[in-house]
Regions:
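Surface-exposed, flexible loop/turn segments at secondary-structure boundaries
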Residues: 57-59, 86, 134-136
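Short beta-strand/loop segment that forms part of the nucleotide-sugar
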Residues: 75-86, 126-133
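Active-site-proximal specificity loops/subdomain of glycosyltransferases
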Residues: 29, 91-157
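Extended aliphatic helical segments
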Residues: 15, 37-41, 45, 81, ...
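Short acidic, gly/pro-rich beta-turn/loop elements at beta-sheet edges
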Residues: 61-63, 88-90, 138
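N-proximal low-complexity "stem/linker" segments adjacent to membrane-targeting elements
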Residues: 2-77
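Generic alpha-helical propensity signal that fires on short helical segments
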Residues: 44, 69-71, 90, 94-98
């Protein structure tokens, strides 16, 4: 999948049941969103894989690229962590436009805390993590690494 700019990179995971070590890690070190996702995605839903995407100042065209990529993947959870450093007080216009496009084009299935689950197509879902609005922003020195960790922790669930 072509990257929109240098702020977006993806990590692709095959999903399986968490091991005892993974469960211990999640209990001790996981980000809050990894615990919230249990209330956002129904237990009956199973994904074969997931794609973790941190996004800051991405063009709304990202949704189109994700939808095209999703056509070749079945039962995939796309985890989009829309983030912004805390030193920037107002939400980025690009982040707001991306979220507005998602809300306009996709059907929201579930919502819990700063997580919103959307149907991307018949076989795949998009989980949007809000780490860009006031109070949810990522500490400035942690940046994209923190966004990746949030997505990876969710993927491990």
């Amino acid at each position: 999948m072509p990257a929109g700019d240098s702020h977006t990179t993806g990590c692709y995971y095959n999903v399986s049941a968490p091991s005892a070590a993974t469960k211990k890690y999640l209990a001790l070190y996981a980000e809050a969103e990894a615990h919230y996702v249990v209330s956002c995605i129904p237990n009956a839903v199973h994904y074969d894989s997931c794609l973790c995407i941190p996004a800051f100042d991405e063009n709304a065209e990202l949704l189109t690229r994700l939808a095209l990529f999703a056509k070749s993947h079945l039962k995939c959870l796309f985890i989009l962590v829309i983030n912004q450093p805390a030193r920037i007080t107002a939400a980025s216009k690009a982040n707001l436009a991306l979220v507005a496009t998602i809300e306009k084009k996709l059907v929201k299935q579930q919502s819990h805390h700063n997580l919103n689950l959307y149907a991307l197509n018949d076989a795949n879902d998009l989980l949007v993590v809000d780490r860009y609005t006031q109070g949810n922003q990522i500490p400035s020195l942690q940046g994209v690494g923190q966004a990746r960790k949030i997505a990876a922790d969710i993927a491990l669930r």
